[in-house]
Amino acid sequence: GCPNFNQPIGSWDTSNVTSMREMFYRASSFNQPVGNWDTSKVTNMQRMFSQASSFEQDVSNWDVSGVTTMNAMFGSCTSFSNNGQSGIGNWDTSSCTNMDAMFAGTLFNQPIGSWNTSNVTTMSDMFANATGFNQNIGGWDTSAVTDMYRMFYRSAGGMTFNNGGSPSISGWNTSNVTTMREMFDGCPNFNQPIGSWDTSNVTNMLDMFRNADAFDQDLSNWNVTSVTNASNFMVGASGLSTTNYDSTLGGWSSQSVQNGVNIHFGGSQYSTATGLAYRNALVASGW
């Protein structure tokens, strides 16, 4: 890291550069306009501005069509929101496979719902601690994603994410996801109908809706047969309504679930008869 570097390098000829990995990593003073750089040959932008806490410039015009890894590109680049410009939403991200922690810990809140994410395999920590992010990303192709660990996480709570108020996130293809651990942990506003998600390959749901107070959806259609860890699933949250809780317990109790799984539904209350029967069936299966 070069914490004092802040020179005007916006006119550099970068037309043959293939990697910008960690270029401004920990360059906490850097905040120069580099939006006109030719990035057409760049394939790696891993941690490019990570911890460059002063950087807040418009990079909308960058050609990122060849970039395969963007993990932690702006991670902990705390001031970054593309200088308030929405053009970053036009980036061609079709080659990217890794978006891990891309906007973690930033002020970023730009409309990126049209990004091509068809080749992305990991979105873990992508918006973790990005407290202001609340855009509609329901149109993303998540069919290749395997890891959504802590995607919208903040341990202290206060995340504003609710998919921009749109239920479109219900259409995400999550058939290849194996971990949703802490995915919405600390998202008090999130409450979208995601009951149709394919969770058949998910093994880890630990803390998934921890402190997600607003979340109240019917999850009865979720396939939880692969889940081995669901500890503190909704701990600290208000929980589901009796209707949704009964329905969820009913759908899950009819499945051949793994033995020895602990789960916490926060403040959820089942009905005296029906819900209790479903609960007992799950307990009998080792939950």
Indicate residue ranges for each PLM-predicted region.
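Negatively charged
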Residues: G1-W287
